[in-house]
Amino acid sequence: ASAACNEAIQKYGADKVTNGTIGAIMDDEGKLICIPTVEKVLRSLPTNELAAYAPIIGLPAYLEAVKNLTFADNKPDGYLEAVATAGGTGAIHNTIWNYSEIGDSVLTSDWYWGTYNVLCQEAGRKLETYELFDENMNYNIESFTDKVNTLLADQDSLLIIINTPAHNPTGYSLSEEDWDKVLDVCKEHAKGGNKKITLLVDIAY
C-alpha cells in the first residue's frame, strides 16, 4: 500500500494524494511532527528515565499497564504475563520464532500487513492465507476452517495471526460471534493434545 501510494504521488502530485499508509504524522510540508502533549512529556522526563536501560523483560509498571489495557475486566483465570518487545513488529517476530517451527506454515488472512511475510521468511517459515471475507463480505469461517484443517494435517503445531480490531488494510474487526467460531475450530484441534495452536492477536490498531 505504501509503495502504491508513493507511485500515486509521483503520478498525480503530492497535493492530490493523502498518504495514510505509514504510522506517522506529517505537516503540510511533509515534515515529521509529533503530538504536542507527547513531545512535552518526553522532553520533561529525567535522564535516567529517558536514556537508561529498562529491565530486559520491561518495567513492572508498564507490564501491568499493558495487561490492564489489553484485558480490562476480562482477564483470564489462567496464566497471564506480559513481556516488553522492541515495538509491535518485535512482538510478532518473537512470536513467530518461539511459537512455530522452522519449515512450518504460519496462517493469516489473504488481506494482511506485508511485513508478516517478511518476518516469516526471515525465520524460515512460510506464510499461508485463508480468505478473510465470504461472498457476503462476512468473516469467512469456512475458509479459515479449511485452511486450519489442511495445515494441521501436515504439521503438529500452528501459529495463527489475526489482526483485529481495525484490521490492516480493510478496517474489519471480528465480532464476538466470529471469535466464538474461530475458537471453536482451534479447540476442536487442540482437545486431543496432539496438536498445538497459538493465536497471535495483533491489536496494533
Residue ranges: model-predicted function:
Residues 46-198:
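Conserved core of the PLP fold type I
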Residues 23-27, 31, 113-114, 165-168, ...:
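Short, solvent-exposed loop/turn segments at secondary-structure junctions
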Residues 1-56:
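N-terminal "arm"/small-domain region of PLP-dependent enzymes with the aminotransferase-like
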